[in-house]
Swiss-Prot record:
Classification via InterPro entries: Flavodoxin_fold, Flavoprotein-like_sf, FMN-dep_NADH:Q_OxRdtase_AzoR1, NADH:quinone_OxRdtase_FMN_depd
Key words of the record: Flavoprotein, FMN, NAD, Oxidoreductase, Plasmid
HAMAP family in UniProt: Azoreductase_type1
EC number of the protein: 1.6.5.-, 1.7.1.17
Name of this chain's protein: FMN-dependent NADH:quinone oxidoreductase 2
Catalyzed reactions per annotation: 2 a quinone + NADH + H(+) = 2 a 1,4-benzosemiquinone + NAD(+); N,N-dimethyl-1,4-phenylenediamine + anthranilate + 2 NAD(+) = 2-(4-dimethylaminophenyl)diazenylbenzoate + 2 NADH + 2 H(+)
Length: 206
């Protein structure tokens, strides 16, 4: 049985293109592969930014945590458990000021946990611990950042790929929807191009 986790983060909710196409992929994969589909909407239920309760709570035993620490670490453990249980992860990220949303950054801050999702070798080299999973990363941007003059300002795609790889999620396929702000025809073409990418993903999975 295949366990699929979809994580969306667009403040626009279902109207966001990253959410739309991530949902199409996740639901299409469930149809093709069977199994379960779990959903985490970071815009509707944003995780808090990490604070002292989380930082201090994760380095002490459960029996010595304060109520605030237990709550903070409990949320992080819940988010880690969702990722750990998944065989396939579909991650939707709409670009905000050249990078991912703060909600998505907070999610990564909770699941990037030393000794749990990453560790270090004897030589001091970081090693991701969440291995053997497939990730579909759906990114959305109004401009075109995959090439051309603005490619240097894409602080979303490479950053997310690095964070995923750091915790062991190295099998990543990127699906972009971009160039939607240059008029109706450009938006139509951009969406059609992404729809073709989504079809290719689902045809390969079938």
């Amino acid at each position: 049985m295949t366990n699929i986790l979809i994580v969306t983060s667009s403040p626009r909710g279902p109207e966001g293109l990253s959410t739309r196409f991530a949902t199409e992929i996740a639901e299409g994969l469930k149809t093709a592969l069977g199994g379960t589909l779990s959903r985490r909407d970071l815009a509707a239920n944003p995780p808090p930014h990490i604070a002292q309760a989380y930082i201090g709570g994760r380095v002490v035993g459960p029996e010595t945590r304060t109520p605030e620490q237990a709550k903070a670490v409990g949320l992080a453990q819940e988010l880690v458990d969702e990722v750990t249980a998944a065989d396939v992860i579909v991650l939707g990220s709409g670009m905000i000021n050249f990078g991912p949303s703060s909600q998505l950054k907070a999610w990564f801050d909770h699941i990037t946990w030393p000794g749990v999702t990453f560790g270090y070798s004897a030589a001091g080299k970081p090693q991701g611990l969440l291995t053997g999973k497939k990730v579909y990363l759906v990114t959305a941007s109004g401009g075109v950042f995959s090439e051309g003059d603005w490619a240097a300002f894409d602080f979303q795609t490479g950053y997310l790929r690095h964070l995923l790889s750091f915790i062991g999620l190295t099998d990543i396929q990127i699906i972009r929807v971009e160039g939607t702000v240059f008029g109706p025809e450009a938006a139509k073409a951009a969406i059609a191009a992404t729809e073709a990418q989504v079809r290719a993903v689902l045809e390969k999975a079938a």
